[in-house]
């Protein structure tokens, strides 16, 4: 079960609720459209099209949710989930997850469908893993200031699957939707995107899935496989030489004479990355997670990211 990133869409962040009369009509029309699309093209093609941000947006508009705002994502996926309820086996598609607290039930709902469909432990856990990793990559490796609050997982019995998840940036008043689709063998942590469609562009973004970040990912793994004592000695150097001012520190290795240059930045106007406000050189959390990481010694960057407890702060700390 391989994966590629299919695309990203950015839209305004709206408030309020969808009228009940509109939602019920979206469910009714969505049920008929889903039946026709699957009858004509099959469940795998339907899942594939869900992963296309433009097609997905168009489907929401056709179902009469014609606001170009964040609510289209949550309302459309909820309507589709309700539309196929009770007909999943006949249609050949299955939907797990949703908005807010429901998004955290995605693994359990996938597992339940795996049991009912007799998919087997390996296939079911692979689906659960891809669901979790898509969320981790978009929240930890693409730190663009959007906090995920919606995650929904579509899949077919043949193994095709798609993820539609959305994050919000309250400062910018925008939402960003991320689409994933299982197709072709791709690296989960290196340039998984195949297309980005956005109205808003942010310059202060930590993009650790970029190919240019290869050296950073490699060095992060090198550090994760070094000794905890070695890492802590480097942190002690930071503690002795850090200050609250932004400046460059030039340190010489006593043995080799090799110079190490460190950049210390003050915390100003960087709200899209609140993690940068934490002084990692004095973080007990960082010490705890680094101790765990160095004891486990992940072999690849994907294994590092997949570790429990490793999130945006740990990833950014290693990158810094």
Regions found by a protein language model. Name each.
Residues 52-56, 283-286, 298:
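Alpha-helix initiation and N-capping motif
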Residues 1-273:
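Structure-specific DNA junction-binding interface
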Residues 145, 296-297:
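Short, glycine/acidic-rich beta->alpha junctions
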Residues 2, 31, 284, 288-291:
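C-terminal extensions
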Residues 276-285, 293, 300-320:
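Helix-hairpin-helix
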